[in-house]
A protein has these predicted regions:
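Sec/Tat signal peptide C-region and signal peptidase I cleavage site
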Residues: 41-45
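Acidic helix-start/capping segments at beta-turn-to-alpha-helix junctions
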Residues: 73-95, 144-148, 158-161, 261-269
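Acidic/His-rich structured neighborhood in mature extracellular/periplasmic domains
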Residues: 104-242, 248
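Bacterial N-terminal signal peptides
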Residues: 28-40
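Bacterial N-terminal signal peptides that target proteins for export
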Residues: 4-31
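Flexible, glycine-rich surface segments
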Residues: 195-310
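C-terminal functional modules
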Residues: 301-352
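An acidic, Gly/Ser/Thr/Pro-rich helix-cap/linker signature
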Residues: 46-121, 127-130
Length: 352
C-alpha cells in the first residue's frame, strides 16, 4: 500500500480518540470500512498490474482440478497477446444504449434482406434443423444475423488473446472470464480438434458464426454434417444445429408466442417487472390495463417490458420464448432485436 495513504489512515484513527464515545464508535466503523475498501482496491490493482502471479495460480488450479500439466498451461497462456482494445470495448457495450438507438444497429434493411437470402439459400438445412429442435428457421437466421452478420463480421481477435486479457487484466469480471478460459483449455478433443491459439472470435472470446463462449461450445455445440468434428466457422450444418440445440436446451416452446405489442389503457396500472420471467397470466395483465391483439389462453404466463422507443415508451407483452432468447444474451434489447429481425426475415422471405 502507498506509504502516504498508510500514514494518513493511522493519523485518522488516532484522531478518533479525541471524540466522544458514540461519535468515536461511528467514526471507527467508517474508517474501518474505508480502509477495507482501500485495501481491496489496491489488491485489485496489483492483480491487474501483475497478472503473472494470477496466471501461475490459474495453472496450478487447472492441474489440481482437471489434471492438466501446470507448465503446459502456463506455456499456452504465454502465447497470448494483451489486447487493450478488448478492455476498451468491454467498457462500452451496445446494450447500454436505449432501444431507440440499439434497434437500428441490428434491425436494418440490409440485415433483413441478407437474412431472407440466407433463409432461401439454406431453406432445406434450416427446415431440417428446425424440425429436429423445434426452432423456427427464421429465428436461427436472425441469431446468426445479429451475432455475426451471416458470417460477414470479421473475427478480429484470437479467442486466447481475448480471454487471457479479460481473465487477468479486467478485475470486474475476472472470475467469469477465468472460468471461460478454463473451458477453452478443456475443449480440445476429437470432435473439436483445434489448438486454443487457432480459434478466432469476438472481443469477449465468443467463437464462430453463432458466437458461442467456450462453456456454450462444451454444452451445446453440435455436429450437423456427420464429418466427425464441430466447426462453427465454416460448416453451416454445424452452426445451425448448434443454435437450434441451444434454444431447445433452454426450453424453446414450438409454436408458442414470443412477444406482442401491448395496447395500454388510459388508466393502466404502473408496472415495471424485474427480469423477463413470465409470472403474470394474460388475464391479470389485461385487468391491469395491458392487452394484446391475439387470441391466446387468458392463463398464458407473460410479463411486461417497457422500451424507450423513438416515439416514446413502448410496452410489450413477452412470453417464455422471449426469455429463452435472453439466454443467449441477457439484455432484453438483444432479445427484442432478434425477435423483430426474425419476424422481418420471415416476412421478406414470404414476399413475392
Amino acid at each position: 500500500m502507498n506509504h502516504v495513504w498508510t500514514k494518513q489512515v493511522m493519523l485518522s484513527f488516532r484522531a478518533i480518540g479525541t471524540f466522544g464515545g458514540s461519535m468515536r464508535r461511528t467514526l471507527a466503523v467508517l474508517y474501518t470500512f474505508l480502509l477495507c475498501a482501500l485495501l481491496n482496491t489496491v489488491a485489485l490493482a496489483q492483480s491487474a498490474a501483475d497478472p503473472g502471479a494470477a496466471e501461475k495460480q490459474f495453472a496450478r488450479q487447472m492441474a489440481r482440478e482437471h489434471g492438466l500439466d501446470a507448465a503446459a498451461v502456463l506455456e499456452i497462456l504465454h502465447r497470448a497477446t494483451y489486447r487493450q482494445s478488448v478492455i476498451d470495448t468491454m467498457q462500452r457495450p451496445a446494450e447500454a444504449k436505449p432501444w431507440k438507438d440499439y434497434r437500428p444497429i441490428f434491425v436494418t434493411q440490409r440485415r433483413i434482406d441478407d437474412g431472407a437470402a440466407f433463409l432461401e439459400d439454406n431453406r432445406a438445412l434450416l427446415e431440417r434443423v428446425g424440425g429436429q429442435y423445434g426452432v423456427p428457421p427464421e429465428l436461427i437466421a436472425a441469431i446468426i444475423g445479429v451475432e455475426s452478420n451471416y458470417g460477414h463480421t470479421p473475427m478480429r481477435y484470437r479467442v486466447l488473446d481475448a480471454l487471457v486479457t479479460l481473465a487477468f487484466y479486467y478485475p470486474p469480471r475476472a472470475t467469469y472470464f477465468r472460468s471461460e478460459l478454463a473451458q477453452l483449455l478443456l475443449l480440445h478433443s476429437a470432435a473439436f480438434p483445434y489448438a486454443p491459439e487457432e480459434l478466432t472470435g469476438s472481443y469477449a472470446g465468443a467463437m464462430g458464426w453463432p458466437q458461442f463462449m467456450p462453456s456454450s461450445v462444451a454444452k451445446y455445440a453440435r455436429e450437423g454434417d456427420a464429418d466427425g468434428k464441430i466447426d462453427l466457422w465454416n460448416s453451416l450444418p454445424d452452426i445451425c444445429a448448434s443454435v437450434g440445440n441451444y434454444f431447445e436446451a433452454f426450453g424453446w416452446q414450438t409454436g408458442a408466442p414470443v412477444a406482442l405489442r401491448a395496447q395500454v389503457a388510459a388508466n393502466a396500472r404502473t408496472l415495471e417487472p424485474k427480469g423477463l420471467d413470465p409470472v403474470y397470466p394474460l388475464q391479470q395483465l389485461a385487468e391491469w390495463g395491458y392487452t394484446a391483439d391475439a387470441k391466446l389462453d387468458p392463463a398464458t404466463p407473460a410479463t411486461l417490458l417497457r422500451l424507450d422507443g423513438v416515439d416514446g415508451p413502448e410496452f410489450w407483452i413477452t412470453f417464455r420464448n422471449f426469455q429463452v432468447i435472453s439466454r443467449y444474451n441477457k439484455s432484453p434489447l438483444y432479445s427484442m432485436a432478434v425477435y423483430q429481425l426474425s419476424e422481418a426475415i420471415a416476412a421478406a422471405a414470404r414476399a413475392p
